[in-house]
Amino acid sequence: GHQKRRWNPKMKPFIFGARGDIYILDLKQSLMGMDQAYTFVSNVAKNGGSVLFVGTKKQAQEAVADAANRCGMPYVNSRWLGGMLTNFVTIRSRVTRMEELEAMEADGRMALLPKKEQILLRKELSKLQLNLNGIRNMKRVPDAIFVIDTNREEIAIREAHRLNIPVVGTLDTNCDPDDVEYGIPANDDAIRSVKLLADFIADAVVAGTGAPVSAEEMAAPAEAEAAPAAEAAAPAAE
């Protein structure tokens, strides 16, 4: 949770109480949100859909990349480039450019160029890899996006909604639950909480791409995470 002065009143139904000046999220609501998100994401994956993982804040970058790579899904963890969804054709052209530069580097053509040009091209390549490496294999817009910190990733959410792409997102006490179709009330600042949730969504993808998942199996992972979630929802250091 966050300090009381930073809360969003729309989050009131998801708040258990307060500890000093910090609001504490209701873990029953967190568990319910996790169950709903798990069911949705696993069904998207089961039907051959893709889920784009998005988390550009420092606490989320590693967890988002690791979770997405584990379940074979694309991710954005450095910077959301405007138009990543709404101007996808242009973004794909930048990915193609990145792959062309990588090929030049790999086969030695870049080394044959003048030093100044090599420096410029390597700088361009480094920037492209930083921003686009996680979506190099994303050939079309995703069927859903999973977002850590809906306030920070508001541009990504806005683009998703313009294209009617459902959003799964973490909801801390300062967030707007109306921004997402599937909200998970949770601490979005603590690294342990972020990793837990990113891994949880990756598990849902893996379950969906594997054997059919029963309702009981869908609920099991969320129940197993209930204890760590209690710590995850505790107040993060400001």
Predicted regions and their residues:
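Residue-level signature of catalytic and energy-coupling elements of molecular machines
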Residues: 53, 145, 197
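Short glycine/threonine-rich loop/turn motifs
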Residues: 156-215
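Short His-Asn-centered micro-motif
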Residues: 54-57, 147-149
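N-terminal cationic and glycine-rich segments that engage phosphates or anionic surfaces
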Residues: 1-39, 45-50, 57, 61-104, ...
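Intrinsically disordered, compositionally biased charged tails
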Residues: 207-238
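Long, charge-patterned amphipathic alpha-helical coiled-coil/hairpin "stalk" segments used as oligomerization
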Residues: 71-178, 182
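Short amphipathic alpha-helical/adjacent loop interface patches that line ligand
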Residues: 38, 125, 198
